[in-house]
Curated annotation (Swiss-Prot):
It comes from Citrifermentans bemidjiense (strain ATCC BAA-1014 / DSM 16622 / JCM 12645 / Bem) (Geobacter bemidjiensis). It is an enzyme of class 6 (ligase). NCBIfam families: PRK09194.1, proS_fam_II. This is Proline--tRNA ligase. SUPFAM superfamilies: Class II aaRS ABD-related, Class II aaRS and biotin synthetases, YbaK/ProRS associated domain. Pfam families: HGTP_anticodon (PF03129), tRNA-synt_2b (PF00587), tRNA_edit (PF04073).
Amino acid sequence: MRYSQYFIPTVKETPSDAEVISHKLMLRAGMIRKLAAGIYNYLPFGLRSIRKVEAIVREEMNRAGAIELLMPAVQPAELWKESGRWEFYGKELLRFNDRKDAEFCMGPTHEEVITDLIRKEVRSYRQLPINLYQIQGKFRDEIRPRFGLMRGREFIMKDAYSFDVNEAGADVSYEKMYKAYRRIFERCGLKFRAVEADTGTIGGSYSHEFMVLADSGEDAIVSCSACEYAANMEKAETRKGEGIEHADPRPMEHVSTPGQKSIEDVATFLGVQNTQVVKTLVLVADGEPVVALIRGDYDLNEIKLKNHLGCAELEMAEDDVVVKVTGAPTGYAGPVGLAAKVKVVADLSLEGMHNFVTGANAADTHLKNVNIGRDFSVSGFVDIRNVVIGDACPRCDSGKLEIWRGIEVGHVFKLGTKYSKALKATFLDADGKEQIIFMGCYGIGVGRTVAACIEQNHDENGIIFPIPIAPFQCIISSLSAKEDEVKAASESIYQELLEAGIEVLLDDRDERPGFKFKDADLIGIPLRIVVGAKALAEGKVELKERRSGEVEVLPIAEAIAKVKAAVKEALQV
């Protein structure tokens, strides 16, 4: 491809609305352009990288035995109502009515559609197992789209769905997809971790997220220093409170704490550690108030609490609800003598804890020496907090938990019979008996994978693409392009690389060398051959590797050979 005939609208200035580096660089490198909030045009240069990821995904899906199909983006409401997700999914599901007033939605995912297809077409165990996948544009009405392709409303996704006769078969399908995902992200040149994850709105019994490691990542990743345990923050487990010394309960007493609302203020005012203060949090679960208790130095994990309660919606209570439940303003709530009968859930960290401080359910007042069982009751002790650095590993005896940042690029789910039971997707077994199909689903954010790659591969000059997903593998910077010898040599190298199957961009523009070099660094093509009159007089060209910055002046044939070898090595499967 000749640069002069291609469309790469690079810009020097960083757009003001871009926050993360991938968004900034994809805009500056002419890969994407914003159309509306969370909706982007994929320009030719960016689309080439997208297509590279798609090709790797297709190869690995096909290798794992999955079969490609394509489903509609528009889905009828009745399928979502049948599965129970029409209301559960919330406002992120874009809903609309057609001219006949029939209800539809733009699909953010396709569990209902694929299950409907299978229940109509699969009759016998002989037709199973089967794994179907698609690569398609989807829409999720994010409340706050941001970070470019990292959190858009319209996005390209690969989603696959497996169907098996039993749970053992579903486990085999899950493991195949898990291994395929590892190969996909390894081939894309990414540093990543597979972590245990919450199943969220998709549902099911078990899942893993594939997280690209990056300081800018939205998600926290938890891993053990001694074993293979890894999970995202929503899923990461804690142990029962450790280091709690037994103490005889002391008499509970009211203490005046004027203006002391925060945990830190109360602890300082009373001369205790914040570990001895218990937070009383009032939330609303499916319209009903609930109280969560957690140690003062920890944060509530709302996903864990939501899963424990089995509710569809969970949010922090408004001030008027707090007053109704506790009789006190926010900041002075406590579990003793609540004004309303509500469920009280205590975090594991409180089990065995004695003589702690809580709000007194009265303004400017707290209670000291509070004890569970004597002073109030709880429905149970449950893991409902976020882990912190240094927590004991839940899976081994020697490890401590570490926390990293990551970007989710893939997610695999063991669904079990969640959708097949709701939509009555069954088959006849070898004995002619009707059985429920076991399912799995597996997603990869294609555009997000490219963005995550850039988050992980860049420097102050621009993008540094790994060869497997680079829009082009080599760029030829033709200096003094009007000079016949330089032009002829550039053309000759270009043709030889093309014939060798190298994806090459010939920068034949009539621009200054510095301008061309800056563009080449910005767009991140891995290998660059510079053809200039001075080196060419000796039959040589300059070869530069984008990642290392290493520059060699080599005979033309040797430079071409090195490019071929580098590309061949990078693309080995």
